[in-house]
Each structure stands twice: as C-alpha cells, then as structure tokens.
C-alpha cells in the first residue's frame, strides 16, 4: 500500500500547473473564468433587505436570492466540471492528447458525470445525516474519482467510484485532511478578495465590473489548482507498468 504524502502531492500539483500552463490556462479561461464572469455580470443582482427587516423577511429574501442564482450556479458548475475533465485528460492521458481530443472526451463524459453527481450527492447526504465525520471521510475516499475515469477512460460511474475507493484504501483520512486544508485556504483567500472587491462599487457600476473580473480570475486560478491537486493525489496512488509512466 502506498502511504499518501501531502507534501509530495502539493509539489506535484505545482509542477503540473507550471509545466502545462499555456494549454491548461486557455481551458481554465474558457471553462472557469468566462462562466464566472458571465454569471456575475449577467446574472441577477443581489437582493438587499429593507431597513428593519424581520427575520422572516430576511429568510424569504435569502430563499428568493438562491432561487434566482440557482440556474447560474448550475451552469457555472457544469462548465467547471467539463473544464476539469478536459484538463485532467491533458495531464493524465496515457499516450498524450490534444486540446481538441480532451474537449471531445469531456463532452462524451457528460452522462457519466451526471450519474456521478447524483450518486455522490446521495452518498454524501446520507453520510451527513449520520454524522459530519463520515461525510469528511468520503471526501478522501472519492478524491480520485474524476482522475480515475479520465485516465482509464471509464464510462461506468460505479467503476470509477469503486476504483477510487480501492485506490485510496488506507489513506482516506490523510487525503481528506489534505483536501479539507486546501479548501479552507482557498475559502479564506476567496473571502478576503471578495471583501476587497466588494467595495469597488454596487452591482452594475464600472467598479463592480472590475471587481467581478478580479473575482473570476481568482476563481479560475483556484479551479485550475484544485484540478491539479486531484490529479496529484491520483498520480501518487496509481500504479502503472514501466511503459506507462506519468509524464
């Protein structure tokens, strides 16, 4: 059994980002940055509660805000997932691949990704109902799902889930800790950037546009980095023959 090394995984993630940035940067721009900026500029404006609003009014306002934002958030999530799959394909393809082939592969995988999303949502939901600890554990055990299906060209989502479970055996908590620490760092930085750009101006102003560009650029960079982290986790745990060494 390979013991997961967080430091080595982080170094490998940085190597992946630097080595392939000209190609993956374009994909990150198309699938991470553009959908994000489109949602920010074309999506519904934030709803502001009236002065002296009651808790019920605020709750109603929040639900309405969520309802309006949901289609945009769904579109951004779909685009981000497609982009991640295409980037993973470029990084993990056994015989090398082109950007066009990687994009085609990502679109072919849409049915598989939909089923994966539903199954994982159900599993995480059940785990969260039991206790938060099982849900955190599943983060580590399913971290290799998307790199696995991308590398091995798996169309069966259940094969990807079981493959990730086997691959991360004995390392679930280490991987979960690594991913959670990484996500906390991204969340803190995102909140800081958002707080700074939030003072640029209200929705519809020129300052808001500049702030949205900055926020979307940061989100795109983090999306690329998150994809690299998943790839690095998989690269460290996957075992290949001598003729199939990762480049």
Task: Give the location of each predicted region.
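Hydrophobic alpha-helical membrane segments
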Residues: 1-247
